[in-house]
Amino acid sequence: MYKFAVFGNPIKHSLSPNIHIQFAQQTGFEVSYDKILAPIDDFSSSAQAFINQGANGFNITVPFKLDAFKFASELTLNAQIAGAVNTIKIEQDKIIGENTDGIGLVNDLTHNLGIELKDKVILILGAGGATQGILLPLLKQQPNHVMIANRTPFKAIKLAKDFAKFGKTCGFDLDKIKHDPVNIIINATSTSLYGKMPDIASGVANNAICYDLMYGKQTPFMDWATINHGSMISDGLGMLIEQAAVAFEFWTGVKPNTEQVLSNLRS
């Protein structure tokens, strides 16, 4: 039996056990998958205790992705560039850290929503860890360019410079967003958690695909996109399921089908 879990704080709301148990049923693997509430200041002890119990791997959510990055003994290229880890695989005496967030986002956009990213103008709201985790997979799709807007502009500018070798990027203040047309807007800020939306120019959403990394039937960003005439509006549930599928394959070597799981969770 595979022994998996997800670490977070809070963690009660997590859909990960539901998703991975569906993957297990689909692929025929015996899997246990727990939710573990780790102390805010001591992720490593909780993670090590789980490993000592015979864990095969685990997922990591807010606020422990940087802790997991430091905890891993080895890092994949994705994790190194993302600067954060959301998936760990235990392989003999190795603790291998991976980041599946960006691949999950791209898979949801391209496979589930049918969106072509090549040559598109993409605007990302926010310049924190979530943005850093999705930039490389997005840039690999060869968009025209990726703009990063953040309330603290130097973070956006630095992130854009750090990723410039992978594709055309720029960073600036949220207040500097103009009405210039963009094809895709991705909300990577945490404002949806607090029922808010960044104060940005309304016209920028006109006819744009608007995607919230947060998931929920109607997030504040989705409300904003609706009012401002976004052409296609989606939450991040598909991304959650797609990144989980990449993690499941990382652990087991078998790629699960996400379509039915997404349908089940939507209903």
Curated annotation (Swiss-Prot):
UniProt binding sites for NADP(+): 126-130, 150-155, 213, 236
CDD domains: NAD_bind_Shikimate_DH
Presence of the UniProt keyword rRNA processing in the record: no
SUPFAM superfamilies tied to this protein: Aminoacid dehydrogenase-like, N-terminal domain, NAD(P)-binding Rossmann-fold domains
Pathway in which this enzyme or protein is active: Metabolic intermediate biosynthesis; chorismate biosynthesis; chorismate from D-erythrose 4-phosphate and phosphoenolpyruvate: step 4/7
Catalytic site: 65 (proton acceptor)
Residues holding shikimate: 14-16, 61, 86, 101, 215
Biological process terms in GO annotation: amino acid biosynthetic process; aromatic amino acid family biosynthetic process; chorismate biosynthetic process; shikimate metabolic process
UniProt catalytic activity: shikimate + NADP(+) = 3-dehydroshikimate + NADPH + H(+)
Any one annotated GO CC term: cytosol
EC number(s) given by UniProt: 1.1.1.25
Enzyme class: oxidoreductase
GO terms of molecular function: NADP binding; shikimate 3-dehydrogenase (NADP+) activity
Assembly and binders: Homodimer.
Family designation: Belongs to the shikimate dehydrogenase family.
Identification of the protein by name: Shikimate dehydrogenase (NADP(+))
Protein source organism: Ruthia magnifica subsp. Calyptogena magnifica
Gene: aroE
